[in-house]
Amino acid sequence: MHRTFLALLLLVASLCPKQVQAQSVIPQPREITMSKGFFTIKPNTPVELNFEGEEARQMKAYIRQTLGLKVFKGKFISKVPAISLNLLRIKEPSCYGRTFPEYYTLDVTPERITIMSHTTTGLFYGLQTLRQLMVDGNKVACAEVNDQPRFPYRGMMLDCSRHFFTPQFIKKQLDAMAYFKLNRFHWHLTDGGGWRLEVKKYPKLIEETAYRTQNDWTKWWREHDRRYCHANDSGAYGGYYTQDEVRDLVAYAAKRHITVIPEIEMPGHSNEVFAAYPNLTCEGKAYTSPDFCPGNDSVFTFLEGVLTEVMQLFPSEYIHIGGDEAWQEKWKTCPKCQQRIKDEGLKDTHELQAYFIMRIEKFLNGHGRKLLGWDEIMQGRLAPNAAVMSWTGEEAGLKAAKAGHHVVMTPGAYCYLDMYQDVPFTQPKAMGGYVPLEKAYSYEPIAHKESADTLEKFIDGVQGNLWTEEVPTPEHAEYMLYPRLLAIAEVGWTRNRPPYDNFRHRTIQALDRMKAMGYNFFDLRNERGRREESLTPVTHLALGKTVTYLSRYTEKYRGTGDGTLTDGRRGDWVFKGDRWQGFIGGECMDAVIDLGAETELHEVSADFLQSMGVDIAFPDSVELLVSADGQNYTSLQRRDVERHDKREYFIEPFTWKGTAKARYVRLRAKQGAEGGWVFCDEVKVW
């Protein structure tokens, strides 16, 4: 007892971490020293608390549920093997201007387990570490732990609009979040897939748009069905959460020290709203735009009514308002929007969006709440008290933090859990990107060391996001979440993370425990990893040669620029990054490689990517041409195919073999009537 209390006081005075490997705990504790022996938990092992009240009642119930033990008020004599939870009345430790209410110590000896903290949240997290140290069902490995998180915000987002997930499923995920010390559940409740929240003032939201005509997202959304229906209609698919169910879920989360943050999308991503209330669009018609009309005052009356009920249900500090991917096209020609721009002295539709966001923020602030939104809320002007969720990359979040805004980092390249986590053609359908466990674990939210002190103050944490366009079932959702959510948990909690191999080993142990708890997951033991061809540079006659683009790549998918197709690096599974180049529209890809001199050719090959979830398809037409002077070309091979190959994902080459002489090698690739992207990595010449 005394040495653990001394360790607590020493940590308050000095926050310099010591790296000691944990046995099997995720996230890795700040300090953990393993020792020999075990504490054996028996059915009659008493648990003592030194505090009372509602928090004590909740703690007792949780201990009964997870450990099956009775809890008592008071202190047992030292000869009785017991588990002791002590709430300390001392000042919280602090660092970078933040206090750490989740700090705890855990001391396990063969005779006693002692958890101490100055908050019940810290005691709760000490219990999670205790649970993870258990082996053989009832033995807890002896250890001494001093622990606290790096960031106060460690979150998971679940999209329940594209596909509806039951309250029971959400509670199961809240249990897993608590086990891995995640403390923010971002609940994506509204979007084009359906409105999921009962709003008593506007009953049509659930009556008209909580259900849709089919569950297949590709057929319903991508093939432009997009019709909503009533719950009793034949084939109706969807659902919604009653206000009583929401209250129950919020309370369930709170007992696990998790804050639920609701997201109500605006001004974009609101197709479903207008099927119920078409007067809120610029044209006053349903199915014409995904955006609210900022020039229409009735829009703000509606949203304030919705948000009033949202705030009554969710006591969270933040209300997430989306703010991403607003189309804005209708605003450019809408008389009401143009009048609003004129009246408010705005420059363009970006500033009109900023006006919209700031007006909503003022309403939330007036009710004691803060606005949180995706990083597009920075377009035009950022609302003065808004917090930013940085998803398009890291720059927006860093910019907002340097300007004194609170930020949650969740860049898609590391934190989007709807993307493939292993070789795509071995995996269930996903959104097309590639975020394996190692990539998620490698994320460093504060990579700019020169301004680390400022960033530490305003970057609140990290979040893993599961969008569910391609995730229709609970089993699929868990498969996408785990184990990558464990990496997010450790990134958010542990300042000095161990090497990936260490984390991977601990994760495999954690997954074995999750299996016993009934979770589905991707089995790391079966992981195949990166594309083999991408690991070794390839040498060929066109390596480093100049490329002239007669039809250029898009800047968004530029690879490394003009040298991408001849840099000797073949693409990995992910279409983003610097290995692939993306082309769209018109002739799509038309590139000429200058070999520098007339050269004898025997083979030309280029890999093309198909990833249907993100509208990338193997080209309908590919042609290889050669020239001696760069003016007059001869076609060596042309491949014309209709888009009959409907596989979700593959990488295949277009290859010519033969004999020819040329200085210039030209490769053309384009799509037919169906359109879509062309992605190519390297044009190899031998």
Q: Can you describe what each PLM-predicted range is?
A:
Residues 536-570:
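Predominantly extracellular/luminal regions of secreted and cell-surface proteins
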Residues 24, 94-300, 304-318, 359, ...:
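Feature activates predominantly on carbohydrate-active enzymes
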Residues 55-56, 164-166, 192-198, 267-273, ...:
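Flexible loop/turn segments at secondary-structure boundaries
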Residues 572-637, 648-686:
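Aromatic, loop-rich ligand-recognition surfaces of beta-strand-rich domains
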Residues 1-24:
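Bacterial Sec-dependent N-terminal signal peptides
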Residues 22-151, 476, 488, 492-522:
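Contiguous, structured surface segment used for ligand recognition
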Residues 370-376, 381-386, 392-537:
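Flexible, acidic glycine-rich loops studded with aromatic residues
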Residues 273, 279-283, 287-384, 391-398:
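Active-site neighborhood of glycoside hydrolase catalytic domains
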